[in-house]
Regions:
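Non-heme Fe(II)/2-oxoglutarate
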Residues: 3, 16-101
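A eukaryotic "domain-start" boundary segment
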Residues: 4-10
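Residue-level detector of short, conserved catalytic/binding motifs and their immediate flanks
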Residues: 32-35, 116, 145-147, 183, ...
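A structural signal for short, well-ordered beta-strand segments and their strand-loop junctions
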Residues: 36, 60, 108-111, 117, ...
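A structural signal for well-ordered alpha-helical scaffolds and beta->alpha junctions
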Residues: 42, 46, 82, 91-95, ...
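Non-heme Fe(II) oxygenase catalytic core, chiefly the N-lobe of the double-stranded beta-helix
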Residues: 51-54, 86-143, 149, 165-168
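Proline-centered turn/helix-capping motifs that create local helix->coil transitions or kinks
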Residues: 57-59, 105-108, 152-157
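Catalytic core of Fe(II)/2-oxoglutarate
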Residues: 135-143, 153-270
Length: 270
């Protein structure tokens, strides 16, 4: 299936729900703007996408105090439908419509898939509260939106692996967004957009397709560059101290080496 055909279907769903999505984002944007929409694609297509997910052993594993998950952006190694659906979300009609919903004038997709692509998480894997890196890989444009398309059939909220956003900071109560099959969640990314993935408690694969949108303008006034920054969960006092020190160290490195010491592997090398 071609990306243009997939994009047509996504666009139709967004147009149908546009008013409710605008309301959701507008009422939340003063903290962490977000919306989500279900039944993004016909069920048979969404199921086909899930079945195309690769064996996690063929993906890169990220395992540290920050996170534990499988990722890849090298989409030409896998079933073509995965690449097609990722880039369907980069169709300029969809980008423009989501920009209208979120009231962002200039918005660009990222064909490098910097920190995007696909991810897979299994039992006991997690993603701690964090802020996404403020810029694209070349530090030219501002990262402003995170798009997460969940694709695991019959995934119950009790299984964990759900998106959590922390509009009042990580010491206060989070909002949980169920990573429900065939659901798209969109959240704003700025220096207060703390979000996480709850630990998975069920013996199955939670699969996600990720995109980021960028802009010429920062998401907030007086925004500055920052690296991806992790924190501990409220009960993880020691981990939180370690991760805050790690954030400071990596920011210090970027002040000396603006693009970092090591080139990221998490991009699509075509």
């Amino acid at each position: 299936m071609k990306r243009s055909d997939i994009a047509d279907l996504i666009l139709e769903r967004l147009q149908i729900e546009k008013s409710s999505l605008e309301h959701c984002f507008k009422t939340s944007k003063d903290s962490i703007g977000y919306f989500f929409i279900d039944d993004v694609l016909p069920e048979d297509i969404a199921t086909k996408i899930f079945r195309a997910f690769p064996d996690p052993n063929s993906m890169e594993i990220k395992k540290s105090l920050r996170e534990h998950k499988y990722i890849t952006a090298q989409m030409n190694k896998y079933d073509s439908i995965l690449e097609e659906v990722i880039f369907a979300f980069q169709d300029l009609r969809i980008v423009q419509l989501i920009g209208n919903i979120c009231e962002i004038n200039t918005l660009y997709p990222d064909n490098n898939l910097y920190a995007g692509g696909i991810s897979l998480m299994r039992k006991e894997q997690f993603l701690n509260p964090h802020l996404d890196n403020s810029h694209d890989k070349d530090r030219r444009n501002w990262r402003v939106l995170n798009l997460l398309y969940y694709i695991s059939p019959n995934w119950e909220i009790e299984f964990g692996g759900n998106l959590e956003i922390w509009p009042e900071g990580i010491k206060n109560k989070q909002i949980t967004i169920h990573s429900k099959f065939n659901r798209l969640a969109v959240i704003s990314t700025n220096d207060a957009s703390w979000h996480s993935v709850s630990p998975i408690t069920y013996d199955a694969s939670r699969c996600c397709i990720s995109n980021y949108y960028f802009s010429d303008s920062p998401p907030k006034k007086n925004s500055i560059f920052y690296v991806t920054s992790f924190r501990g969960r409220p009960e993880q006092k020691i981990r939180d101290t370690i991760l805050q020190a790690d954030n400071l160290l990596r920011m210090g490195v970027r002040k000396v080496f603006p693009k970092g010491l090591i080139k990221t592997n998490h991009i699509y090398r075509k």
